[in-house]
């Protein structure tokens, strides 16, 4: 692969304020420099912040592409997230502040969480679940989802969380691939005022899941206290959570788990092919997420921290559950949609609980931009002090909007790059020391080594190329469940003869200051007249125009240029699609990054096809632009969007 052309230049910079720097955990480059000199030593030292039942003897064994961290050590994830806080001054500190979509609220102190997790762990044991057994968790965003994860960890069972929005087929495939013994689900969940029939979906899936012996059902929807009429229960197999809880002891002894014992398996959403069961281990994963939570968000004892991600994604695992709770944080958890019952729901929650750290996705930020600032201005967001972005690269203009309208120019923005496979944040600013640039994830986290390479593994010092991680890290995936060869082929075979190089599948560019800019999946790179252009740059140029809320670009076949650029655009409130605006946007891109990147086609749309985790599905947009039959749409949040786009595009072409 040739290098990726770098077209978009960003010169705006934002250093941390002296006031923020003075109070930050990391306020100079000493930590980063020490970690760069000795990454293993850095992670070894950070692992000491955890409570170990048996101290580890060897920090790292590395036989590429296989890493083992903290060999000889034993620990328990639930002890690190709960017990150690209960036995200290955080006993009565709020651990979890939960708000349901209908407006119901529950708060759990660390002591409350401790009691609930012990009871849940004993429920699992009563149903025959033990160390090494797999438990599927198919729940809405309710506290029992967190409790179930920690209960599994307490007894050494391996949890695999399945996003509550997935259809029965997706649930079935994940249960069967992992060989789950127990399913934990709910009678339903709330989404935009409608009840999602989780138990009914689960029953459909379980018709083809021979490994499931028992089902534990949480009562979420009810017309009155104790109303069990919403779910059909199968005698002998299905058990109500609230009933079983009354039948078990209050204390459950935590299992001593080896550092390399599996903590959980999480399936990537699998937009193509069979979903991959990413395997994460106890000691390394906990070390990675606890350390990155503390330093990336500058997490302090008094913070109220809200990661808006669903529990079904890695961000929910790492930065709603394990990372913050290992640090003894107060976490906000919300069940519903950001625009229900109105478009200010997020800001209402931020104001109500005095949220100080907000971690959300670019797709949400672009939606807020599209809706306008009137919803933000209704609320006092002055408690916010750190803003985070996760899930995909953030366009510079969305970054600036976030900085101005949510952060009031006062809050550092940590634009984080990482993956399900990496387990924890890999590239990010540190808010007390890093000068940020809109759209750049900046530099690797301390203890992480990255490089920009060409197709022959030659290192590039500036410009565009392939992102590689060149050194093992504690929270890295260990394998793909049941398919170790796929692990090697997918992540460690990009550069033949170099099994030490992890390839995440992303292109990136390095600027003159050594900052990294993620250009998107290498599969999405455009090839226009021999020039390789990252989709991110063209999309950012479009979003830079005041009329555009969100944009996605793909390549389509062109007889002369190889590929032409097709853009799909949603407009901000107050703007109307027209031929003149289409021409204006094409000229704007040409002016911003060059005539080479001028889109050939622009289609205005009310929405873009996205996965349930909010990522734009460019594969389907390519199908539309090329006039092909649509590929697999099962992971779409709203399949009607892509059908409507296809009709629109075909009408415009004709």
Curated annotation (Swiss-Prot):
In its record, the post-translational modification comment is: Acetylated. Deacetylation by the SIR2-homolog deacetylase activates the enzyme.
**Required cofactor names:** Mg(2+)
Positions that bind ATP: 391-393, 415-420, 506, 521, 532
Gene Ontology terms for molecular function: acetate-CoA ligase activity; AMP binding; ATP binding; metal ion binding
The modified positions for N6-acetyllysine read 615
Q: Name one Pfam family in it.
A: ACAS_N
Xref: SUPFAM superfamilies: Acetyl-CoA synthetase-like
Q: Where along the chain is Mg(2+) bound?
A: 543, 545, 548
Q: What class of enzyme is it?
A: ligase
**EC numbers for this chain:** 6.2.1.1
Q: Which UniProt keywords apply?
A: Acetylation, ATP-binding, Ligase, Magnesium, Metal-binding, Nucleotide-binding
**Positions bound to CoA:** 191-194, 315, 529
Query: Which InterPro entries does this entry report, sorted A to Z?
Result: Ac_CoA_lig, ACAS_N, AMP-bd_C, AMP-bd_C_sf, AMP-binding_CS, AMP-dep_synth/lig_dom, ANL_N_sf
Describe the reaction catalysed, as an equation.
Answer: acetate + ATP + CoA = acetyl-CoA + AMP + diphosphate
Return the CDD domains for the record. Answer: ACS
Describe its function.
Catalyzes the conversion of acetate into acetyl-CoA (AcCoA), an essential intermediate at the junction of anabolic and catabolic pathways. AcsA undergoes a two-step reaction. In the first half reaction, AcsA combines acetate with ATP to form acetyl-adenylate (AcAMP) intermediate. In the second half reaction, it can then transfer the acetyl group from AcAMP to the sulfhydryl group of CoA, forming the product AcCoA.
Q: What's the name of the protein?
A: Acetyl-coenzyme A synthetase
**Species in which this protein is naturally found:** Gemmatimonas aurantiaca (strain DSM 14586 / JCM 11422 / NBRC 100505 / T-27)
Q: Which gene encodes it?
A: acsA
